[in-house]
């Protein structure tokens, strides 16, 4: 159980091949982030006797919205929060947001951060430390453990600028990505920087966790600043070179 503020907790539900659906719980209520499929999420919520208050959608891909419509059939009062620019691709949204919007859920203030790159109109959700013991970021497919999302719709410049935005958050921000890619990303980073002690140590640590059936996530922004080559790329040219190299790389 993570991200505590009294009974404020965040839980992972592992689905599909490598997706993670994060469930943020406060008292008897829950918020779900990017539900790929409905079955495991619905089962988990019902077993815990939780009421679904909202679903946060970072972008339109099926492995992020695939379970939403079934979940809102079970909990029709739940809000579906998504970018107002994505009405066509997320037509079932009921609470539309834009860059820098701030809204409240379950006694927490959430800020919307527009992060183009992986897709157009991709958004991230940020909860500041005044509402929890640490800052919390749900970046969707923009920022991963040791990596970033592929550029499926956006440009290198857009993704570089999006990562710059996220890198400006406080270093104690906990990062809750939507995929378990950390091991592969760190192996790739180590292939480029084989003497990087921070990457070596982090890879060993998360491999031990994975061997025990644990998740490598969440990470922290502080940790990513030491080991995420995309996040610390000094310019767009360097970022573009890294992204092209990663796209061709095979573990």
Swiss-Prot record:
Pathway: Secondary metabolite metabolism; methylglyoxal degradation; (R)-lactate from methylglyoxal: step 2/2
GO BP annotations, alphabetical order: methylglyoxal catabolic process to D-lactate via S-lactoyl-glutathione
Highest rank taxon of the organism: Bacteria
Entry keywords, A to Z: Hydrolase, Metal-binding, Zinc
Enzyme type, top EC level: hydrolase
Catalyzed reactions: an S-(2-hydroxyacyl)glutathione + H2O = a 2-hydroxy carboxylate + glutathione + H(+)
Pfam families: HAGH_C, Lactamase_B
Residue ranges of coiled coil: none
Co-factor requirement: Zn(2+)
Sites where the protein binds Zn(2+) 1: 59, 61, 118, 141
Molecular-function GO terms, alphabetical: hydroxyacylglutathione hydrolase activity; metal ion binding
Disulfide cysteine pairs (residue numbers): none
EC id: 3.1.2.6
Positions of Zn(2+) 2 binding: 63-64, 141, 179
Protein's UniProt keywords contain Transcription: no
InterPro entries the record matches: Clx_II_MBL, Glyoxalase_II_hydrolase, HAGH_C, Hydroxyacylglutathione_Hdrlase, Metallo-B-lactamas, RibonucZ/Hydroxyglut_hydro
Cofactor note text: Binds 2 Zn(2+) ions per subunit.
Family under the similarity heading: Belongs to the metallo-beta-lactamase superfamily. Glyoxalase II family.
Quaternary structure and interacting proteins, as annotated: Monomer.
Purpose: Thiolesterase that catalyzes the hydrolysis of S-D-lactoyl-glutathione to form glutathione and D-lactic acid.
Name of the protein described by the UniProt record: Hydroxyacylglutathione hydrolase
Organism of provenance: Prochlorococcus marinus (strain NATL2A)
Gene name of the record: gloB
């Amino acid at each position: 159980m993570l991200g505590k503020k009294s009974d404020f907790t965040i839980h992972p539900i592992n689905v599909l091949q490598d997706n993670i659906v994060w469930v943020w719980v406060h008292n008897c209520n829950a918020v779900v982030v990017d539900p790929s499929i409905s079955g495991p999420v619905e089962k988990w919520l019902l077993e815990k006797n939780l009421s679904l208050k909202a679903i946060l959608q970072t972008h339109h891909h099926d492995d992020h919205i695939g379970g939403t419509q079934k979940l809102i059939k079970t909990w029709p009062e739940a809000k579906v929060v998504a970018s107002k620019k994505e009405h066509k691709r997320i037509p079932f949204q009921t609470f539309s947001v834009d860059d820098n919007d701030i809204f409240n859920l379950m006694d927490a203030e959430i800020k919307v951060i527009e992060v183009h790159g992986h897709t157009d109109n991709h958004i991230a959700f940020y909860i500041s430390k005044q509402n929890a013991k640490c800052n919390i970021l749900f970046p969707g497919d923009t920022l991963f453990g040791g990596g970033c999302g592929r550029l499926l719709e956006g440009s290198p410049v857009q993704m570089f600028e999006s990562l710059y935005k996220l890198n400006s958050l406080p270093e104690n921000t906990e990062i809750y990505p939507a995929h378990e890619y950390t091991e592969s990303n760190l192996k790739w980073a180590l292939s480029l920087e084989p003497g990087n002690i921070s990457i070596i140590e982090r890879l060993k640590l998360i491999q031990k966790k994975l061997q025990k059936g644990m998740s490598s996530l969440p990470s922290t922004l502080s940790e990513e600043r030491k080991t995420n080559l995309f996040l610390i790329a000094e310019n767009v040219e360097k970022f573009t070179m890294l992204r092209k190299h990663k796209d061709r790389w095979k573990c």
